[in-house]
Every structure is written in C-alpha cells, then in structure tokens.
Amino acid sequence: MVVASEIAKVASKTARDIAGCFTCQCGTQFDNVERIVQHFKECRYRDETCKDDDIVVYEPSSFVQDEKKDKPIIVEAASEATSEEACNSSKERQLPALSALSALSTLTTSANDDLWTARLIWQSTNDTKLDNSPSSNYTDLNHKLANYGLSILSIHALMCVECECLLNVIHTAQHMQIVHKLELNEDLLWFQELRTLKLKSPTNVLQTHSSQTHVYPYIRGLPVLLNGYECVPCTKNGTGFVHAIMDTFRHHVRRTHGKVIKLENCIRRTALQTVKNKYAQRCQFFKVDYVPLNGGEEEEEEEGEEKEDAQNIKERMVDFCFSKFMEKNQQRREQQDKGENKKRQDDVDQATDNNTNTILEDDEKDNDEEEEEEIVNAREKNLLNQQFNWTAIVKKLGENWDQLVRFEYTNGIVTLDTIVNQLIRYYYRGFRHLSGMTMGMRRMFTQGGSYSAQERGLCRLEQKDTVVRYAQSAALYLIFLLRRPSADSGIRRHLEAMCGATVERKEGGSNSSSNISNVANFDSAEDDNDNDNDNDRDSNNNNNNNNTNTDDDDKLAYLELHEALKLAFLQQYDFSKNVQDLEIMEFLACMSLHKDGTSKYAYEISACFAPLIYTCRLVAACELQRLIDEKQIDLLSIPSFQTAGSIAYAHVFCFITLGQRNLYDVLYETQKVVRDIIRTEGYANTLQGLSPSTVLFQPRSNSMYPCIGDAFNNMVRLDLSELTALYEGMFAKVQDLLKELCFDMNVEKLLPISLLRSIGDDINNSKLGYSFFKESIEIRSSHSVLLRTILKNSELCHRFFPSMSKKDLTKLFGGVSDQQRNECDNYSNHYNDNSNDNDNDVFLKLHWSKSAIKKYETKASIFNELLFCLVYISAGQPARAQEMVYWTLRNGKYKTRELYLMFGRLMIYSRYDKTRNMKFAEKPIPRFLSEPLSILALRYYVLVRPLEALMKYVTTADRSKVAVYLDFMFVIAGERLQRDLPYRIFPKATYQCIQKPLGFRNYRHIAHYFKEKNIEEEMTRESYFDLQAGHTRNTALYIYGRTMDNLHYLPSDYFANFFRASYKWQELLQIRDNPTHGLLVETKHPFIKRVDQLEEALNEKLARLVGEQMVEGDKEKDKTNEEKNKDEVKAEMTQPVVNQDSHDLQDQLATTPTAPTAFHYRPGLLQPSQTSVQHCCWALSQYYGLEAKFRSLKQFQSVYFSLLNRMNLITVLPTGGGKSLSFLIPALIEKKRQTPGKVMNMVTLVLVPMMSLRQDMMLRVNEKGLLVCSGNWTAFKDVRLTLETQLPDLFILTYESALTNSGLRFFESLATLGRLARVVIDEAHLLLTSGAWRTALSRASRLSGLYAPLHLLSATFPRQLEMVARQTFCTNFYVLRETSTARENIFYFLHPYDNTEFLLDLRTLMKRTKVFEGDGRAIIFCRTKKDVEYIHRRLHQSDLFAHTHVTIYTGDVSDEERQMNFDAFRNANGKTRIMIATKAFGLGINYMGVRLVVHYGLPASSMDYVQETGRAGRDGKYAIAALFYEKYDSTWSSYVEDSMKNFLNDNTMCVRSFLASEMDGECVCCASFANCVYCSRCSDSLLGEESTVSTMYGVKPTLPETPKPAIATHSRYNASFSSSPPPQPGNSSGMSAMNTNTTSTTPVSLSELSEITLFPSSVSPTWKKSFGNANTNLKYGLEDMSLSHRRGHKRTYDEHLNNVQQGVNHDMNRVHGSVGGMSGIVGIGIGIGDGDGDGDVDSRTIHFAEYKSRVQAVKKQWVDSTDISAQLERFFRVYKDECLSCTLGNPDTEIRAHTGKACPVRLSTCYKCGKADHNLRECKLRIRFQGLCLFCGLTKFEHADSDMAYTSDCRSWARKANLISLVYYAWNNVQYRRTIADKFLQGDVRD
C-alpha cells in the first residue's frame, strides 16, 4: 500500500464535497494540496518502497471529463507485476504522483478553495477490543489515558474515543491540543514518552485489516469515515442510501426525490464504513451502527434474573451516591455560610482592600456598565461647572487637591481599613435600631424630601455589597476631613480612640470576626420558621459569653465612632456663609473632577450622594435611639420631635430638615441640581418608529456582524414579526440542545408540563438554601436520571468511561452496596470520618473522559447563552444586564433567590439596587416566562444542571467549584455569567437567527417602543410594563429613565398585574402554546364576533327598531328607503373592519367607494319640537331649580342637538359655560322616557383626560342623585349584555381606560345592541394635541365606528383643530362656538417676575380679590413639580402667610393624597385657601370660589393659559388672573410656543385680543365688550385699583352681586355688531344675564310642569316672538344665518374640505340655529327636505346613513396603507394570461397572450437593461432594490403568511407575475423612466 496514492485517492474523491480539513495517517492536518505534497516529501511514514514513478494517475483532462460525468477519480498504485512495456505504452497518460497532486491543486483551487478540502478520520470498530486484561502491559496506562479520552486497543493501536479515530502516537499531543483544545502543560512530557511505545499507525492497521472481497454488508475492523451522509426519506421508506461525497448525494436527492424536498431536510450526518471493491476499483460505503466494546475478554452470559438484579443494584447505588453527592454540596455550602466566621471576616477585609483602590471605577461601572458606548456629554459638564464652580473650589485647596480623596491613609493607629470595618459594624447596629422603630418614626427621617409622599421611611440596606460600598464612601469623607487642616480636632480624637479600642481588642486575642458576625447576623435570612439558625444563635450566645471582656471595647469603639460621625455629618451652617466654603462641597468638588481639572460625568457625581445622605440619616437615627436609651426623651413626645426647642429637634431633627442650611440640606439641594442636569439619554437618535410594528434602529458598528437587508443611513429595519421569528428560532435551537444534553431521552414523560402547576413554592420562605426544587419528589428523584442513563447505555458509557467495561462498573457499584450494608450493620461507624469523603467518593473512582466532559460543557454553555436571550426577550419588558447576571436559583446567606414558581410559570423576581436614589431599598420586579419556556428551563435545571455539577467535581475534585451550578441561573464555561458577556452574546444570537445584529441596548429600547404602540394598559398612573422596565409611566412618555418598587406592603394583586403584563407581551410576540389555564388573563378575543352571533343580535335590534314607536318626528316614513338603508348597514356590520390574512377582503375594501353615498343632514329652517324643548327645560329645573335658564343659545343648541342623536358636534363654550349639560340633560330625559319592563336605559360614554376631572364630575353627578354613573367599565365586561341588562346611565372614564382594545370591544357591543346613546369627549383639545395621550389618539378613530354620535367638548378649541378632528375621527362635525373665549369678569394681569417682591405681590392680589374672606380661594400654577415644591417651601417659611394653609396638587402624588388635598381646598369652611398645582389641576375642575389664579412662569401654549385662567370666577364674580413671567421664557424657552412669546414681547397687545385671535379667530379687545374688567394692557393700573378702573372706564372691579346660580347667569355679546347695551333681565327679546334666584332645587315631575312657566326668556314657546326677524337678531348680537343652509342644499364631505382649504368662510357650517331668509322664521331643528313639524325625516334612517359613511371612512384608513399593493395585485390577476412587456413596450398594440419568457420584445436580451450585447453578469445597470424579497420584489408586510417570503420558494403573486423583471423593463422605457425617477429617485434618470 502506498501512502501517496492513498492521499491522492482521498483528495480526488473528496476534493469537491467533504468540508473540513485533510488529515494524514500520521495525524497532521492540511487545508490545501500544496501542503500535502510538501508533507509527502518529508513524512517519516512514507513507504520506502514507494517511488514517485510508481504512482499512476489520470491526466487533468481526464479528471475534468470524469468530473462532469460525476465519477470519482481513481488513483491506484501500479501493480508489481506491471511489465515495463505496459508502463512504456502508457507513459503519455502517466504522471508522477507529485505532478498529479499539483495538477489537482491547480484545478480544484481555481474552482473553489473551500469545496475540495476534506477530513478523513480512521476509526476502529467494535471488534477492536480494549486491551484492559490484567496481564496486559497497557492496563495502568489505559487508566491514565482514559482521562484524556484515549485508549490503546488490542490491535496495538491508539484510538481517540471522542473523535472515534485512530491516531499516530507521535502526533497524539498535537491532536489533543489542536482538535480538543486541551492544555497539557506538565503532561506534555508524558505524551512525548508515549512515542517509545511500539504502536501501529493508521496505515498499518489499514493494511492489516482491509478486505479484498466483492461485497461486504459489514466488516469488523475496517476504517470508518465519520463525516458521511444519510438520506432521511430513503431511510424512512426502508430502502436507505448513504454516501460520503456531497455531489453524489445531491444528485441522488434530485434524481429520487425531485425538487419538492429541500436538501437540508434530507441530509443527516452518519458514520460510514469504507470497503475497497476489487472489481469496481472504488470504495463502497456502508452505515455503521456503532456499539462500543465492553471489556477486554468476552464476558460469560449471566442468567436473566441475576443480570436484572445486578442492574437494579447498580441503578440504586448510582441514585444513592448521587444523592449523597448533592447533600455534601449542600452541607458544605451551609457550613461555609454559617459556621466559618473567620472566612466571612476575611471576605469583608478582602472586599475592603479590593474596593478601596477602585471605588470610583466600580461606581462608574455600577451606574452605567449596561451602556454599550458612552458619548461625551459636554453640555452636561458645562452645566455642572456653571452651577457649582467646581474648578474655583478645588483651586482654593491647592495643587494637590486630588490627594485629599486618596484611599490610602495611615496616620498613627488611624487607618482606612479600620474605619471601614467599624463603619460596617456601625451600619448593622443602626439596622437593629431601625427594626425597633415604628413606621411613623422612620418616616420622620424622610419628611420634606422629593419622594417623601411615597417613602415608607428610613430602611435597612438589603445587600452586603451595598453596606460595604456605603461604608467606604462615609469613611472616605472622614479621611478627607482628617486631611484638612481646618477640620474639627474632635473627629481625629474620637477616631483615634475608636482605633485604639479596636487594637486593644485584637491584642487581647478575641475574635473580632465573631462580633461582626453577631452584629451582621441580623442581615441573614429573615422569618426563619424552620429554626435553621438556632445553632448559630446558640453559638453566638456562647461567643458572647466567652467574649464578655471585649463587650466594653466594642461598645467603646461604637460610641467613639458615633461621636466622630456626629461631628462630621450632624452639622449646621450659618446662612451667611458661602456654600462653596463648606467642607462637604469641597469634598464633592474633589470627587467630581478628574486630575486634569475637567468635570466627570453627571452620573458619576450623582453616585456620591446616596451614601452620604443615607449615612447622615442613619447617624441621626442612632442619636435618637441613644437619647431614648438614656431616657432623655420618651416615645410619648413624638409629636414634639420636630418642634423647635425640643430635645429631639435640637439633637436630631434640626440636622436633617430641609431649608436649615445643614449638611443634609446642602447634600439634598446639590443632588437635586445634579438630577435636574442629568437626563437619561433618549433613543430618538438610535431608534426611529415607522409604524406600530416597524422600527429603524442603529446597531453598534461591528465588522463581525455586517448589516444584511433593510438598511437606511446606517439604520436597520426591524419588524415586530421578526421578533417572533427570533424567539421561535432561538427556542427551536434550545429544544434541540436540550435533547442532545439529555441524550435523546423522553423528558416529556419524565417531567410533564403539568409539573409546573403541581409543584408548590413557599415564596415567603427565606431559609438558607431553600428553593422550590426541594418541594417535589419528582424533581429530587430526577437529579440522577442522566447519570443512570449514561451507565445504562453502552455507547454513552463508552464515550464517558472509555477504559471501563460494564463488568468494572457493576463491580464498583456493587462494592458500594456492600459497604452500605456493612455500615448499616455497624451504625456507630457511619460516616464519622469526613476526612475520607474524597477517597471514598465513588464518582472519583470512575475513569472519566475529559474530552467528553469538555464537549458536554460546551453544549451546556451554548444552551445557557440561548436561554439567557430567550428570557431577556420573552419575560416582559427587558431587564438590565447587571440584574440578570446575578439571578440565583436558591436562597443565599445575604441574598434571596430570583427563581420562583407562580401561576404555573417560572417567575423571575429580581432585585436591583442601582436606583436607590432617595429610597435606599431594593426594588423587586416580577417577570413571568411563557409556559413552553418555563417547562424547558425547569427540565434543564432538574436534569442537566446536577450532571454538570458532578462533571465539574470529577474534573477538579473541588466542591467549591460545584456551587456555581447549583446557585446561579446562567452558567457559561463553568462560571457565572460575567457582566460583559450579555453585550456579546445577544448580538451574536440575534445575528445567527435573523441576520440582524440586534444589540442588548437596542432591544431594550425597541421593546419599550412596541409596548407603547401595541399594548394598552387599563390604568392611569402606573403601568406594570413600565415597572418591569424599571421606570415610571411619566418617564416612559417623555424620557427613558429608571425607577422601581419594593416587595414590602404590596397589594394582593401585585403579582397578578405583573403576570398580566408579561402575558400581554408574550401575546404580542405570538408565542405559541402559551395558555393561561383560566388564570387572570382572558384569551384574546377576535375583533368581530362570529357572523351568526352578530346576525342574531342585528335581527333582534332591527326588530325592536321596526316595532318601536317614534317619540318625536314625522309619522310618515319612507319604509322602502329605510329598509334599504338598514340592509346596507347590516351587511356592513357583519363584515370585519380589516383582515390582513384575506386577499379577497382586501379587494373588497379597496373597491369600496370612499366618498359617503348617503346624504348628510344639516340644520334646517324648521321650528324645534316643543315637546323636546319642554323636556329640556324640565331637566334643567331638576338640576338647578325652577327659575334656572340656559345661559346662551349655543348652550341650548348643544343640549338640543345632543338629545336628537342625529349629528356629531363640537361644542366650544367658555370655562364655566355649562358644557356638561350637553350630555347630562339628554341622559336624564332618556332615562325618564324609557318604558318600564321593556327596554332598559341608554348609556352615555364620557371620556375625560385626568383622574381629578373624572372624580370631580362623578362627585357632582352623584350629589344630584338623578343619574347613575360609573368610573369602571371592567366590572361589566364578564356580564352578558342584553336589552334588559341593567347598566349605569353614564360611564365616566379616562382616555387610557376607555381607548383600549378590550374597552372598545365592550362599547362596540353596547352600540350593536342600540344602547349607546352618545360618545362625549371632554377637553377634546388635549386628546388631539397633547403627546401624553398619543397612544389613545391612535385608537380614537375607532370611536367613529360606534353606532352613536360623537360630541367633542372644550373651552379652548382653536379653529385649526376642527380639521384635525375631522381627519382623526373620519367624520364631519358641526361646530357650536361662543363668540369669545376670554371672560368678562376676569382681570388679566401681566407682570415680570421679581423674586424679592413676588410674595408681597401675591398677598396684595389676594387682598384685592378677598381670598382671605368667605370661601375665597387662590390657585398658583407652576410648570414643574420642582417649582411647586419651591413655592410651597417659600410660602411655608414666610411670615406673610403664617396663618394660611397651603396644599399642593401634582401628578406624582398618590390618588388618596390628591383627593384629600382637593377636598380640603374646596371645603368652604376649611382653612386651606391656596392650592399650588401643575397643569393637571387646570382641566375641568369646577369650584366657584376661586378668586385668584396665579401663573408662576409662562404657560406652554395659549390653550393651557385659557384652561388654567378659566378656573377663576366661575360664579361670574370679579376675579384676577395674574401671570408672572421671566424674560428668558418669553425669548429663549424651548417649551413655550412662539405665539405666547410674541404675545409677551408685544406690550401693546390686549389679552382678550390675543385669546380671541388664537381661540376664536376673531379680532376683539376689552373695549369691544359692553361690560368687562379691562386687562392690565388696556388699564393703567398695575394691580387693578378700584378707583382707577372705575374712574377711567366706568366699570366696577366687582360685578353686581348675584345669587349663586346653578349653572351660570351671564352672557357675552360681540360688540362688533352693535354698541347698544345688552337687554335687561325680564326682557324676553334677548338672552341676557338673568338673576335666577334659585328658590328650590327639588325635582319636579312632568305633571307639575303645567302649573309652572317652563320656558326661559331665551327660548320661548313662540319662536317668532322670541327672536323676531333678522333685524332684531342683528340688534341684539345674533349672527345673520340666512345664508347657512337652505332646503335641499347638500354638499359632500370632500366639497366641504375643499371650501375650507380655499378659505371660504365656513362659519355657516358651524352654526346650527338659523334664520329663515324669506319667512323670517327661526329654526333650530334639523331638516333635510320638505315638511314641517317634529322631525320631518326619520331620525333612524339618517343615523344609519351617517353610521355607514363613518364605517366606510374607517375602513378606508385601514386600506390606504396597502392600497398600492392591492391595486397591483388586482391588476396582475386580471391580466395574468397576457404579456405585460408588450404593453409597456408599445401600449397601442394589442396584448398578445404569451408568457413573459417567450415575449419577442425581451427575447435574448439582458434581464436588467434589456440590451442584447451582454448577459446579466456583465450588466452595468446599478439600480438595486433594498429591503425587498429578491425573488418577487415585495416587502415583508406585503407577503401573506403562506408565501414563504425571502426564500427561493417564494410563492407570492408578484413572483408569478414576474414583477421585478417588469419593473426593470419599465425603467428602460423612456415613457416610464421619468415618472419613476421623479417619484422615487429625486429626478435622477441615470443608470
């Protein structure tokens, strides 16, 4: 046999097919043929008898020819019997071996360097017995080789068990290092000694054991080619096909299975046996079922029963030994945590030593390590330097200022380490004091802070690391004071005494660590119900008894340190002293600058405050406890603790009170400034949202992961469906890995999914080492399953124990069984000697294969990486990396576990201490895994983790290495997941799955965006999604920040809400097989119910409508038109709005006419129904008494039109104008109209923006008791809705709670039943303009789909918003607007802000408006919460308001506290007269007694200004609206609108003129009103003096006193029409301000109305008498509306929009009370044709027509996004049988029916450019389509689910239509190129 010929043969056969590298029989590997040739010259195993001339090989030409025929190249050695003549005759075809190989190299390398390389490994099969006989010389050597996965066979050859191949003994070391990556180090010499063994090489084995017969189904002893291929379909069919050459295998698949099955679905790697066929001159391949050898000699077969008994004994012993192994690990962990006090002290000292030199770096990492790349924020540094002037402070300290904050300090006996250790002890003593305090007392240490409303008080620190870090920071400040020459000498004296006591205690021989353990024992697990720490307590008590001599020393050290801390932290400063001269500011300056004097980042500076503030509070708490212990104070004096002059105040609370210029106050105020400067970096520059399901994100630049696919300006496009694909891809990989790790065993049967719901978990159990794994017998008994499987399976046993036979294993475990039996007989000797545990450990006696363990550990590491990514993606809002790396499986000494079981899922309950800020407590956040991921993770932790721990133990023989597998959730390469690995793992995993490098930080931002756009939370203040993400709701809407909550004092539904949040996120990701089993969350219902159910409901509703009598209107109806309209609406409602999965429905929607087909009703010229007018007046009397009258015509029209339920309205009335009556009166009338026992009440839906407005409105409705209202619709979502279901009359809800998917479905069902009367949106301008409700606005258009009219209410609705409303709600509105927004009774006062005079001006204004008298109140509006606190503090400290109570109202205050403050403010008999609030209080709050509204700072917009000033003077009396502004706000402020800036800068502009032009589009001023209080711009008086105003303008500053009306009694008139005075009370010819003496508010019945005059002067029974003719109307200020609408005049919605855009005066379209031009009869009714009387047209027919138009408009919105694609698809379907290339090439010609490939226009032309002189590869046309499917040209969203997008098997309609080819052809056509270039390429027509 010739070595060179074998090399050539293998190379030629496998050159094109087998991937990998070629391995010579000597063990050397190659990656190209040149190296093989060079190696052949030097290889020592080259056959000496072989010469180059003896090698025969085909010529290169023959090689190429044979390659085309798919025949393997035959290279064989020349026979020894070959004659010389034969050789000479074939010389032309014979080449030397080296030349042949060179030719082969030239040919194959030029084709593809990667296709020819191969790896051939030789293996010995199961007849090669392991030479382990006792008489063998290799017995001991084999035991040692087994550790490396090597074995010497009986054929005297060396085999690698892991690779299953034969090795050359000389190259064994290289093989282990290169292939298995093992570090030999000291064993390298031992491997070199192996060369002396006389073992056979692979070539010698081949020569000895090869066969020459014809066919061999299985030959024992022949080599095996491991990288062979098996055909899966053929194997299933029973025929079977295997081969080693990929090309041959590929031809077989195409020839046998065609193109239906993909190649990757057919191929399977397998081990093949190669047999030389003598006659065919080629190798044949056979599949090998490898069965490892069991022993050196053939074993005698045992009897069945004996063999079964031996197997049972072995399994029982394996289980017993494994349980013993796990128990020893647990015992060692408990001993390490509990008993080893000295080790714990060493850990503390070591942590101190390690952290003292790197605290700044650690703080930097702790605060921002999760940020992948920090960007230098120069602006932030400049703001800090400008605010604090750090550079000037450190300049005073000298050039060596940086030495003052060094961590190395030793001065006599005072050392930094001693101070830190004693501070740790001090903290734990302080924690003990805190635990004895009551909640109220602990809260006293946090009062006055910005978070005081939410804090539960000063709390202990949870984590030991946090205690050490805080102690280091406090110690560093003490050292800084010691280095300062001006420091208090008492601090040094006390610290020296403390250190002296510490040294004396150590010299006395006492164990200081025991005392620390006693103090820190409080930090151990709490609620120890199992008494697991009793022994520790006893030992601690014994230690205390033995160390009684050191108690005095400990107490002395504590007292001395306490005194030093008091001098350092409990300090007060004089207000005259400059803050920059304080020691604490000098310390902060040194900590905040680099050595070169530049400022650090703001987050680095912010990290310094929490430890110092907390220490200051804790020292104060310890001082308070000292006073209590010394009985200087008692707990009965707590109310006087914060009273100046008390002992507690003088010694404790004066040092932690804000505004007292103490250290605490300085730290707090400085921290607030830093926080104001700090803003968490937004993601607008790295993330752009395109749609609710699509984003563009900017990945981190990395050459390893190039961007593939949709990329725009370095930003990558990501769709929500890709996240689903990412999860599914990762989950499939994890499933396969788990199957491999479990050796293909049936884990579903062993650990079924029902186990998740059957296992118990005691969440409150904090016992050391506890986890829910201990609660289940199934789990405990499953730990050893994989080990038993290895020992039972021969192949696995041979893989992991290659040098041990079954007989050896049975003998080993049998000996353990005998030993156990003996120990049971002699119980006294049962494991008394623990020192021999390692020697007697049975697992260490097994000869494990290190390479097999290494391979298993690698797979497990990959599994952990993918599991980490899956948890990060699917558990809800993503956690931070620093959280996840520390997640544990069981309770530890200082940290409880994070993995729990709840609701049948794995719950991760993480605690993250990064954002302590002013709370100082860990804030746990629950996250729930999906059910499939939960059971997969559970199976891994139960089955695989114990085996990993055992393997780690047998490789290291160190039990301490095992703890990481039993403690942490994610273990990579035998270690806990490191902090930097998530940023490398996640991009790699995502790139492998979706080819997009999604970074760790990218996904956090993307998940937040998708949540905001796609998931609606039915809550107002807090979202559990935001809590999972680690920030509040307000932060989520504006910036991306961090806050969390705490475990203690949580509500009972806390976990349920988080479970709901996680489930909704998993539902958004479309995770399969994720049921809730009826817990908490209902399954997501479809948008439209089943057609048959809807048909039944519609039939019932239509039957009721047909049989019901009309209450008002014309009795004669056109029944034919009515039935036609009803049938059309019924057909529309039975169809879903949109279904993206149905192409037919898209065709239907796209062809639906978008313009409304039905007529639009408009206000006509008819008289209103007198019955309806009587009902309106009766309802008004029920609310406000018999003499109450409507305030204005517009108010009455709003009520009347709302009652008719025929139109969509926009009502714009001034604040206090009675807008609420527009739905309260109709609701009351409808309630009285209902027939008892038949149809139940109608429901009115009212939407409000704020919780405060909802509470105020509900309070007012409930006080009257006329209607039933509810603020929570969810109480009725489980009720089956029928016509008889009892429901509230009003649903008053916030935008967020109503505009959700579930909420809209509920009200859609009400509308389908015909029980939804109207939808009212209060403060509608906020919904359309404010960004806080952007998510609700995205769903607002669905309100138009409800079968009910829309009614928008607002006091500030600019005219430009009318178009926005029409576009948002897809319908037309009729506008009712008062003539002026500005109020006549308000004095608008503008004044620049002066800090020194502000309080005096405020008091003067309060006196002028008589706020201090009666029920007068004042409101101060501020822009931010910071300003609210500032004003509150100034008023509290000022003597001017000493007897005035002040309260606050902000968004972050709890609901209970806000309600309490509001009740105190509106209490007429209360003392609270001033409310300081943000804009949240300026929306709809109704309190009549507000006399003064003050703006501290400029409002953001004119709408805000009108809303907030509208709180004043709502009873019609004199009031002042004062605006104090700064020049900066009017010039540079970015949040103030330009219109407000221009208004402030123009001192000549009247306030009412500005408001009228902004809100009403009119030009008026103060002089235009007949009776109003002039503004400060129109008056010479600065503060509105009475004499000045009365003298100059004849107007009294206080309007005439009127009794408090129920609704309002004055009216405004536009003086531009007439200068005559308004009509006086009693005159029925106008609508004047009436003095309505409300004598009775008792509701009256309809029968009593006959005795009472029901009609107000503004609405009389005779309309002609009330209004007169047009001239009368003009006289009294009524608009001439004769041109607005005439009979039969109709215009479509599109015409109306065109008129608006052309500037047509569309006041006529917004006014609905009109004057008859010819007859002079005024009508405020509704008419659309001829007729008269009460409703000349059927209202229900009109309603159906309007509803149909709105439904069509809503559908049009859904269709617009896919309109182009739908049109193209329909076009191609119509012309699918005709050639479109002919059409584009010559539109005038007739389209001929032929395929595109046969088109004569495109025949033999380039695919791209259409030219015939080159092919596609040579085309120079550079146009490419990015982000599209390369096979069809569609985007991912335009594909159907079954299209198999972005694959070669794409089945979309565009591929069938050859869309891409058609687009290229259109580009090459001159007629279309310009159009395409102008639309998409900015006019660029170049190729």
Curated annotation (Swiss-Prot):
Q: Where is this region: Disordered?
A: 329-372, 504-552, 1110-1135, 1613-1643
Keywords, comma-separated and alphabetical: ATP-binding, DNA-binding, Helicase, Hydrolase, Isomerase, Metal-binding, Nucleotide-binding, Zinc, Zinc-finger
Naming one, the record's GO cellular component terms include:
nucleus
Compositional bias of type Low complexity: which residue ranges? Answer: 540-549, 1626-1642
Q: What is this protein called?
A: ATP-dependent DNA helicase tlh1
Instruction: Please report the organism this UniProt entry assigns to the protein.
Output: Schizosaccharomyces pombe (strain 972 / ATCC 24843)
Write out the transmembrane intervals.
Answer: none
Q: Care to name a GO molecular-function term for this sequence?
A: ATP hydrolysis activity
- Spell out the reaction equation it catalyses: Couples ATP hydrolysis with the unwinding of duplex DNA by translocating in the 3'-5' direction; ATP + H2O = ADP + phosphate + H(+)
Gene name linked to the record: tlh1
Q: Which SUPFAM superfamilies does the protein's record reference?
A: P-loop containing nucleoside triphosphate hydrolases
